[in-house]
From Swiss-Prot:
Topology of this chain in the membrane: Multi-pass membrane protein
Protein name: Long chain fatty acid elongase 6
Any one GO MF annotation of this record: fatty acid elongase activity
Topological domains, Cytoplasmic: 52-69, 133-135, 181-202, 252-274
Domain of life of the source: Eukaryota
Gene Ontology terms: biological process: fatty acid elongation, monounsaturated fatty acid; fatty acid elongation, polyunsaturated fatty acid; fatty acid elongation, saturated fatty acid; methyl-branched fatty acid biosynthetic process; sphingolipid biosynthetic process; very long-chain fatty acid biosynthetic process
GO cellular component: endoplasmic reticulum membrane
Localization per record: Membrane
Amino acid sequence: MPQGEVSFFEVLTTAPFSHELSKKHIAQTQYAAFWISMAYVVVIFGLKAVMTNRKPFDLTGPLNLWNAGLAIFSTLGSLATTFGLLHEFFSRGFFESYIHIGDFYNGLSGMFTWLFVLSKVAEFGDTLFIILRKKPLMFLHWYHHVLTMNYAFMSFEANLGFNTWITWMNFSVHSIMYGYYMLRSFGVKVPAWIAKNITTMQILQFVITHFILFHVGYLAVTGQSVDSTPGYYWFCLLMEISYVVLFGNFYYQSYIKGGGKKFNAEKKTEKKIE
């Protein structure tokens, strides 16, 4: 490793956790992460073409491990960032918890925030399971993966106050989502309404982020101190708007249009299994 570079294990094993080291590590890897995301797009569509005339792979075992691993990681991350955010609430106040970074990026919540950024590359693996098992690949899926990963890497070293809430909400929703996927992959019968509510939670986190961003934006234009930058602020706002539109459309197509065809089909499947 070239002199001056910070390794993953150096950040992981430094006690107490050093946010400055983690920022250096992400800064060193963000360009590689960007090119990985570009390669990801090429690979998934190339692989999709290759799989056109092939039978789907039976990946039950690997999928079980994958979903269980991400469910455990997301749950631990949710717990760590929940305690970190509660500390900010009680020590600095509700609004300050997203206006300024405080101590959130230090300690256990800081370590999991750093791991959160890195995990966005690992989550590309979700798409491989979709393609190799010949499940439908939606634009929403890969677009969301690519944009979230690049935003996470690019904005990490900027110390954005509102990223504390984004990280916490994403961890929390993912802990439930991957827990649901894990149960499904293990063959556990899960009520159809749970999938519907997970989509609702995903949309809700984007809506909450909008309120936070609007407040931070108001404070910024009125000359008050905020931990934000114009470039990353607009990147985040436009990204979140696109997510509300895409996830909202998915919700409409799945659970409202035609009386909720997807939802009703899943319920019928449940009855057949029972």
